[in-house]
Amino acid sequence: MRLTLTSRSRLFVLSSLLFISTFDVLSAQAAPANTAPSFWQRAGDNLSDTWHHWQSQDLYVPVMTWHNRWTYDKEKTDRYNERPWGAGYGVSRLDCDGDWHSLYMMAFKDSFNKWEPIGGYGYEKRWRPLEDQDFQLGLGFTAGVTLRDNWNYIPLPVLLPMASLSYQRLSFQATYIPGTYNNGNVFFAWLRWQF
């Protein structure tokens, strides 16, 4: 299999790099010492810290897509792909509160069995509900850019909720893509392995 970069995939890579570098520049503009940093300042700092000071590398493996049966006609769900073959790579870190930050890129087969790349930033507030500190629950969001075949691979911004169940280096992470009847309303999950 030969990987070739089309003009659309180049646009995706450039959009992702622009997204990261924009926040890198924002983080360089420090807030005055006597004021709390703004939302944009904190976001820029988190992106910059994750980009420059990551603690682990991550392998992403998509494992399931589920189209909400209450919001789709059966003939649609019978045609859709719910096995999102693909893979991804990212870097991540835990902050001083133990919360997770990541920069990632992933490509997978979408509902129409077409390749869909996505890249962006992920954040999860982490809880350790048991004495075993290796078991963690996470709740947060992902913000980034994706490209879809049915949108002619135009870069589309995404902001989605994210939740996880983690044990040691393995995480089961998921998001829900909201939508309307016969559109959106998709549960998407993947495994993340830290190495």
Swiss-Prot record:
Molecular function via GO: acyltransferase activity
Entry annotated with the keyword Transferase: yes
Domain of life: Bacteria
GO BP term (any one): lipid A biosynthetic process
GO CC terms: cell outer membrane
Subcellular location: Cell outer membrane
Subunit description: Homodimer.
Descriptive protein name: Lipid A acyltransferase PagP
Organism: Dickeya chrysanthemi (strain Ech1591) (Dickeya zeae (strain Ech1591))
Organism taxonomic ancestry: Bacteria, Pseudomonadati, Pseudomonadota, Gammaproteobacteria, Enterobacterales
